[in-house]
Amino acid sequence: MSIRFESIEKLTELIKNKEIKPSDVVKDIYAAIEETDPTIKSFLALDKENAIKKAEELDELQAKDQMDGKLFGIPMGIKDNIITKDVETTCASKMLEGFVPIYESTVMNKLHDENAVLIGKLNMDEFAMGGSTETSYFKKTLNPFDHTAVPGGSSGGSAAAVAAGLVPFSLGSDTGGSIRQPASYCGVVGMKPTYGRVSRFGLVAFASSLDQIGPITRNVKDNALVLEAISGVDANDSTSAPVDDVDFTSDIGKDIKGLKIALPKEYLGEGVSEEVKTSVKEAVETLKSLGAEVDEVSLPNTKYGIPSYYVIASSEASVNLARFDGIRYGYHSKEAQSLEELYKMSRSEGFGEEVKRRIFLGTFALSSGYYDAYYKKSQKVRTLIKNDFDKVFESYDVVVGPTAPTTAFNIGEEIDDPLTMYANDLLTTPVNLAGLPGISVPCGQSNGRPIGLQLIGKPFDEKTLYRVAYQFETQYNLHDAYENL
């Protein structure tokens, strides 16, 4: 097997045993990118010169047996809405084309401390608004399992690059499913941590009460290793939680006998395709065979997740994106004749159609005549959804269901139909609204397109999710499939 498909754990072992140099790993990764990414189109920018320089510095430390850091010499790809100092960060938007940050995000500082190596920035839906990576201003990323299909979104580049063996891990952001849904479509492992588990400092905000950064990998243990590296309280983010337990790997191999798992009947209901239902039911039987107890439950407010999510997220986006005015930074219209024209033209020319749609929706929902009818009511629904989960978690350890209602759809199939596109978030948005952790792991395929199983946990109980996911992975995984892509 090529180095490009090795796990973080295996690469770390090879580096620690001096069987391979960090610079060899990085050069192998760039060779893979040159071979594969012209087709997949997962990267927006590469930082090759700095990456090789950093890897060669790590070679010297390796020779001196000074291999500090959990991710020493491990290559990484970062979603392009996460600030990277001195590396262009565009959010896949014309609005930020050419923007080079002068500071580092907290997650990047943490990863640098662990001696990971930045390979480049990954494609996404513009400002993380979309479910297919088709709203990117620069390019459309393809699904490595089927080049006629989307990779999902908004972290489509992050999932596609990992599946194609172009990086062992990537970071994405998840506002309503943007890590888990592309992980499902691309047959990889994607974790949306509990809200507050990972610092958002340096994440370009979409919806501040929903956004969360998380890792995407090809196996469960690698995912847990990366989350350990990026978790922790941060003085720069007032919403980051002071939770001490960031050990997700020590108990990961523990069995799940006696664990109580809830399967909501709504998660296998209307809108979920038959092939997804079949795969998830088979996955549930696998969990039972591993000793877990699985019962059917109800989360009655699930159907209100999408409408309440899109009102809340769009409202927050309309405020967060007000900073892009054509004056301080970002796209600046050359044709404007007045200050008012500058605002209007810079924003209308700099933002894509989906971003403008959500700004309009959010501004409408926050307007004085409609605030109570839409925004306030949506926040009440959010509370009801959280209460549903709280009630289930009084008796159960984990909630299980599909990650997405269908497998990946074809490129161009839904981009002009926003309501159909939004419906793909049916099973992921409630997790963000409730602030809970959720992980997607591969559980099947239909016509060559992967299907993801979603596991949802109690607040700050990512450890249990990793245990269940790890045990399930011993029975079903796509490890042998990646190299054949």
Swiss-Prot record:
Chemical reaction(s) catalysed: L-glutamyl-tRNA(Gln) + L-glutamine + ATP + H2O = L-glutaminyl-tRNA(Gln) + L-glutamate + ADP + phosphate + H(+)
Lineage: superkingdom: Bacteria
GO biological process, one term: translation
Keywords: ATP-binding, Ligase, Nucleotide-binding, Protein biosynthesis
Annotated active site: 79 (charge relay system), 154 (charge relay system), 178 (acyl-ester intermediate)
Enzyme Commission numbers on file: 6.3.5.7
Signal peptide (UniProt feature, chain positions): none
UniProt keyword annotation of Ligase present: yes
UniProt GO cellular component terms: glutamyl-tRNA(Gln) amidotransferase complex
One annotated GO molecular function: glutaminyl-tRNA synthase (glutamine-hydrolyzing) activity
Short name of any one Pfam family annotated for the protein: Amidase
Family of the protein in this entry: Belongs to the amidase family. GatA subfamily.
Summary of subunit composition and partner proteins: Heterotrimer of A, B and C subunits.
Its biological purpose: Allows the formation of correctly charged Gln-tRNA(Gln) through the transamidation of misacylated Glu-tRNA(Gln) in organisms which lack glutaminyl-tRNA synthetase. The reaction takes place in the presence of glutamine and ATP through an activated gamma-phospho-Glu-tRNA(Gln).
PANTHER family from the UniProt entry: GLUTAMYL-TRNA(GLN) AMIDOTRANSFERASE SUBUNIT A, TRANSAMIDASE
UniProt-recorded name of the protein: Glutamyl-tRNA(Gln) amidotransferase subunit A
